[in-house]
């Protein structure tokens, strides 16, 4: 008997090593992915209201896929760029 269970996405796929190539550190990756996940979540929230302030997912998504998983796949696909933010001059 075969099953049609798909491979899990998100934290295990894409691999962390590939994701770290897009940023300077694990901390930067966490902040980067969290900000994008918030944008995706806000996009879905605003769909019903007709207000589209944020850009929707840049990759194909599944019905029950979480915003963080979508953000990690976008980062891995190279669809987003991360620019370092410089602190205030002292």
Curated annotation (Swiss-Prot):
Alphabetized GO MF terms: DNA binding; DNA-directed RNA polymerase activity
UniProt xrefs under Pfam families: RNA_pol_Rpb6
Domain of life where this protein originates: Bacteria
Any Gene Ontology biological process: DNA-templated transcription
Enzyme class: transferase
SUPFAM superfamilies: RPB6/omega subunit-like
GO terms under cellular component: DNA-directed RNA polymerase complex
HAMAP family to which the protein is assigned, alphabetical: RNApol_bact_RpoZ (MF_00366)
Family indicated by similarity: Belongs to the RNA polymerase subunit omega family.
Function comment: Promotes RNA polymerase assembly. Latches the N- and C-terminal regions of the beta' subunit thereby facilitating its interaction with the beta and alpha subunits.
Subunit structure: The RNAP catalytic core consists of 2 alpha, 1 beta, 1 beta' and 1 omega subunit. When a sigma factor is associated with the core the holoenzyme is formed, which can initiate transcription.
Protein name in UniProt: DNA-directed RNA polymerase subunit omega
Source organism: Streptomyces avermitilis (strain ATCC 31267 / DSM 46492 / JCM 5070 / NBRC 14893 / NCIMB 12804 / NRRL 8165 / MA-4680)
Upper classification of the organism: Bacteria, Bacillati, Actinomycetota, Actinomycetes, Kitasatosporales
